[in-house]
Regions:
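Short, solvent-exposed amphipathic alpha-helical segments in soluble enzyme
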Residues: 67, 168-172, 230-233
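C-terminal substrate-binding/catalytic lobe of Rossmann-fold NAD(P)-dependent oxidoreductases
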Residues: 76-83, 87-214
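NAD(P)-dependent Rossmann-like dehydrogenase/reductase catalytic/cofactor-binding core
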Residues: 200-246
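N-terminal Rossmann-like NAD(P) cofactor-binding subdomain of oxidoreductases
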Residues: 1-105, 110-112, 204-208, 243
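Conserved active-site and cofactor/substrate-binding residues in soluble primary-metabolism enzymes
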Residues: 32, 56-63, 112-120, 164, ...
Length: 246
């Protein structure tokens, strides 16, 4: 089955309790589950009984960063991640959570340095590097209902040019039906991906040769939730990956 909660995203039950303040009552099933961003797991997903659907922020962020970390193209420290989401990202009871703010007409930072989605990102990044990466993540809610735009500030490795970063992302997602890597320095927002299972990624230069900015945009309610669950289901059962999504 496919689980859209966080219950099977965190493989370490102690970490799960630290972040979610709950005892895991199905520890025996955690080993039978896979944390699945389908672009990275499609060849393994059939081997697992339980599919843990990732969080919305981690989906947008990992689609941009994981290929670059795997190829050691970027420095794994001092990464700044600024993610902005429609207020639906705060859950169905968002109004009760932010009673002191008029969330439908203001911008609001929350979960500063402590958002629970960091737990799954820590875990997945560590699988690649075998050590923790150093990053700061701050999510913001915008006065719009849906959509996520993650802005990621990072430093490239010595002698790595922006064209190499861009070409690697293009190569990784060449056959992907849902991920689109835009031309270098393409300004972007969330409008193109709303109500779709798509992700758009843009790599942009800065005035410093060793620093770049990557933008990654998804619909938090589709690629960040139900759409990704359907994509995972299609792959798990051998259906066409885009079934019900295109």
């Amino acid at each position: 089955f496919i689980d859209l909660s966080a219950d099977f995203r965190i493989e370490d039950s102690k970490l799960y309790k630290n972040w979610y303040f709950l005892n895991h009552n199905a520890k025996n099933l955690v080993k039978k589950s896979i944390y699945s961003i389908p672009e990275f797991t499609k060849n393994r997903i059939k081997n697992y009984r339980i599919i843990a659907n990732p969080g919305c922020y981690p989906t947008s962020i990992q689609l941009a960063l994981i290929p670059l970390l795997k190829k050691s193209l970027i420095e794994a420290n001092n990464i700044i991640i600024d993610s902005k989401s429609g207020y639906s990202g705060a859950g169905k009871n968002y109004k009760s959570k932010f009673t002191h703010q008029n969330i439908e007409s203001s911008i609001f930072a929350y979960g500063i340095g402590s958002h629970r989605h960091m737990a799954e990102m820590d875990q997945e990044f560590k699988k690649i590097l075998k050590s923790n990466i150093e990053y700061n993540f701050t999510p913001h809610l915008l006065p719009t209902f849906r959509g996520i735009l993650s802005t990621i500030y990072l430093k490239v490795k010595k002698n790595v040019k922006i064209t190499k970063v861009h070409s690697e992302l293009k190569k990784i997602y060449k056959k992907s039906i849902f991920i689109k890597v835009l031309k270098i320095n393409t300004p972007m927002g969330s409008g193109n991906v709303l109500n779709t299972n798509n992700c758009e990624i843009s790599v942009c230069k800065t005035r410093y040769n060793n620093k770049i900015i990557i933008f990654s945009s998804i619909d938090n309610l589709v690629k960040g939730a139900s759409g990704q669950a359907i994509q995972n289901m299609n792959l798990a059962y051998g259906y066409k990956e885009s079934l019900g999504l295109k």
